[in-house]
Curated annotation (Swiss-Prot):
Belongs to the bacterial CoaD family. It comes from Chlorobium limicola (strain DSM 245 / NBRC 103803 / 6330). The gene is coaD. Pathway: Cofactor biosynthesis; coenzyme A biosynthesis; CoA from (R)-pantothenate: step 4/5. Its main location: cytoplasm. It comes from the Bacteria. This is Phosphopantetheine adenylyltransferase. Substrate binds at residues 10, 42, 75, 89.
Length: 170
């Protein structure tokens, strides 16, 4: 059994699909570090601090899981620094795999000792993506089956906040 893996992502927000992949990773690895990518090229609904706080609350009952932020740099370098020999990636569809496969080859080139492990979520989460969750929530849909209660509360808070800042169109 490989000791440590990292599970990187934007996690904006962290969904039950992410949690499902994390739990599957814990069946393989003794320790998993959830790594929040602070990617300045991606526009996120939640700040890094908000995502960190939400994930910490979700993983508090998982002693083998920690969460950290990768502000800058390459994921392969980060994995090497942390002594991780595996990168966990959730793959929902073929389209995800094609992209992730290319990234995994690059990571292996940069850090030959690292292996990317692709995990499929439970079938009920195969269509769940953070972007879809945000869109459905913004349109008033119920996303409670797809996110942790604390994420749902934060999501509603963010949406209420954005409604208050929008000018009324008459």
């Amino acid at each position: 059994m490989t000791q440590k893996a990292i599970y990187p992502g934007t996690f904006d927000p962290f969904t039950n699909g992410h949690l499902d992949v994390l739990e599957r990773a814990l069946n393989i690895f003794q320790e998993v570090v959830v790594v929040i990518a602070d990617n300045s090229q991606k526009q996120t609904l939640f700040s890094v601090e908000e995502r960190l706080s939400m994930i910490r609350e979700i993983i508090e009952d998982y002693p083998a899981v920690s969460v950290e932020v990768l502000h800058d740099g390459l994921l392969a370098d980060y994995a090497r620094q942390k002594g991780a020999r595996a990168i966990v990636r959730g793959v929902r569809q073929v389209k995800d795999f094609e992209y992730e496969f290319q990234i995994s080859l690059l990571n292996r080139h940069l850090y030959p000792e690292v292996t990317t492990v692709f995990l499929m979520p439970n079938v009920k989460y195969t269509y769940v993506a953070s972007s879809i969750i945000k869109e459905v929530a913004m349109l008033g849909g119920d996303v409670s089956k797809f996110v942790h209660p604390s994420v749902l509360k934060s999501l509603h808070g963010k949406l209420d906040e954005s409604k208050q800042h929008k000018p009324n169109n008459i």
